Amino acid sequence: MMRLDQSMFWFAHYRYSWLFLILVLTASVNVSAEIIHHELQVKLYPQQSRMSVIDDMQLPAETDSADFTLRSSFTVVAPGVELIVRGQSADGRLRHYQINRLPADGKVQLLYEGNILSDSVQGPFGMPDSVLDGDTVYLGGGSYWVPRIEDFPRCRFRMIVSAPLDWEIISQGMRSVQDDAVIFDMAHPQEEIYLVGGPYKRFAQTHDSVELEVYLYEGDTELATSYLQASANYISLYSDWIGAYPYTRFAVVENRWQTGYGMPSFTLLGSRVIRLPFIPDTSLPHEILHNWWGNGVYIDFSKGNWSEGLTAYMSDHYSNEQQGKDAEYRRKALERYVNFAAEGRDFALADFSSRHDEASQAVGYSKSLMLFHMLRRFGGDELFNQGIRHFWQQYQFRPADFPDVIKALFPGADAEYKAYIEQWLYRTGAPEIALGEVTVSKINNDYVLSVEIRQQQKGPAYTLRIPLEVSLEGNQQPVREQVDLSAKRKVHTYRYNQRPRAIRLDPEYDVFRLLDPLERPASLGRLFGAKQQVLVMPQGASKDQRKAWRELAAAWTGLYKNVRLVDSNDMNGLPEDAAVWLLGWQNELLERFQQRLTSSTQQLSARAVTINNQRLAADRHTVVLLDPDNSRAPLAFIGADDPVAILMMARKLPHYSSYGVLAFDTHQQENI
């Protein structure tokens, strides 16, 4: 199954849209225990965008008939059996067939050939879902280049590929070369078969019996070595943590489209993405881990996609934990939920299939990883890690649903487990916890602390285990307590030898909950996630500037669906129920609201800003300032005059949603 990298850009997983298409076309998928086998002979003719395939399929013996789907550009022949065309998809891309009168041994041969045009369905990076031209071949499950048989969704395969001599071919399975052909043998059940290739330079080394590869368009040995070493390190890490790496190979493959895709045993990274210095220690481990979660244990989507949250927790959260930054990572996860999914915009975690907008990301990633963090805290590291290994041993190359993975990690009794999944998988919303009345009294030589804790969300109480931190006079380190709360209000008492002087509830953000406004510093995400974003364009903007601001508004409308662009002369004041962006240095409203954009660390003047005592002039810098007061409706200023810089803001700012102030070198387009 294809994955999109989330650790850098939080990309949308359009592989799942293919899955939904399959489900619609086949009406119902019988998740059969039977695994079919494809013996594929593939010839590629890239200059003609053409391919031919011989597929010797082994179906279960005594199979009378089978329905399958293939792309409509292929001409298909099925010697010795009856082949019937049943129809095609609404867009004409796919054709549905039935084969009848199958031999008793279940062996069927299909011969097909045709063109692969690159003007088909586009992914989120502008990359077609099927490509075969003089530079690239990319074929996956959504390409329907291998018959999709509705009764047998998983397969093993052996594939022999003939391609131009200067091409390298990548797929799943053990790789070998015979004469001018490349052979792939995949013994483990797969949900789809990939065929990727082009005029690559191949770099390889072996690590603990796993063949590591890097495929680049140019012979950049230093870049290849960095990815080979990082791949070895992370495969060792996760193998020790979970169980042996499930494939014989792992490859990092350069792509001419700027993708961040992850497939079984390889990842497809854009030519610019692959050269970003942080990718080997952020995106790469995320994609490697997906070979266990999602491409090693498959996802039963009927009760939600657990893979994204578990992968984010064991890769991105783990990396931050190693650097002592895990509490802030969790705070940002909770902040994302509040910004984009709170106030009735979320849905049950059991209904999450893939990320398609900010709200689905906040549920399927942020809420999900917090669930796994709470499970780990509930039972402790040892039980959590034992559960992870047991889950892997039980379900590898089989589908598992969300309750399955929770059950493997849950340390309590069955009744508690059922209540847990009901609370976190099927309920929408989040707990809202707060301190109530707090008193300290002295009894004999002890101090008795009485703490009221409330759940303020609408609806019934959650069952929670909440950390409580108590600072005592004379103690440098606070005392850590655990509060078990299953009512909307409860009073807890504690006895100490020293006087309590301060308390903090969930100080390290260990509980999935709504953040208090004081825990949410000003950030771009608060504007992006508002019910409405009002973008105020300066009346005096030039034609080119106005065009650029309109393109920014259009791009953000596509992302957030809540954008309204207005002229400054149409604004008598700022709305109290919307986030407002003041656009451009010459904005007529800027002077009027200048004070709201000024604080002890940022000062705004006519053609410059000062951030942490560093003056940034408008002619050389593009800046973003926010009103730091979260008690008011969000207000932001984008200081940009150059149309190129404005379009840079359109692209870059959505990736900085946790930031509260930004400055860029306008000409270099780099963050300062």
Q: What name fits each language-model region?
A:
Residues 361-451:
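Amphipathic alpha-helical substructures
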Residues 53, 148-285, 313-316:
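Hydrophobic helix-coil surface modules that form long, contiguous segments used
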